[in-house]
Amino acid sequence: MAKKSMIAKQKRTPKFKVRAYTRCERCGRPHSVYRKFKLCRICFRELAYKGQLPGIKKASW
């Protein structure tokens, strides 16, 4: 889990727009966040396997 202070800091509106960055809405992880879902790859995978993300299915070819 991310530091609570960093999660709180990220939720505030930055003084300059370029300072904003993505964090996972579920766990607060700052890296590998899918913008469309606002989830990191780990949380995305967990929710997708549980079927809690509508329209997402495992690829097979």
UniProtKB/Swiss-Prot annotation:
Its cofactor is Zn(2+). One of its GO terms (biological process) is translation. It comes from the Bacteria. GO terms for molecular function: rRNA binding; structural constituent of ribosome; zinc ion binding. Signal peptide: none annotated. GO terms for cellular component: small ribosomal subunit. Binds 1 zinc ion per subunit. Keywords: Metal-binding, Ribonucleoprotein, Ribosomal protein, RNA-binding, rRNA-binding, Zinc. Zn(2+) binds at C24, C27, C40, C43. SUPFAM superfamilies: Glucocorticoid receptor-like (DNA-binding domain). PANTHER family: 30S RIBOSOMAL PROTEIN S14, SMALL RIBOSOMAL SUBUNIT PROTEIN US14B. Binds 16S rRNA, required for the assembly of 30S particles and may also be responsible for determining the conformation of the 16S rRNA at the A site. Part of the 30S ribosomal subunit. Contacts proteins S3 and S10. Belongs to the universal ribosomal protein uS14 family. Zinc-binding uS14 subfamily. This is Small ribosomal subunit protein uS14. It comes from Geobacillus kaustophilus (strain HTA426). The lineage of its organism: Bacteria, Bacillati, Bacillota, Bacilli, Bacillales. The gene is rpsZ.
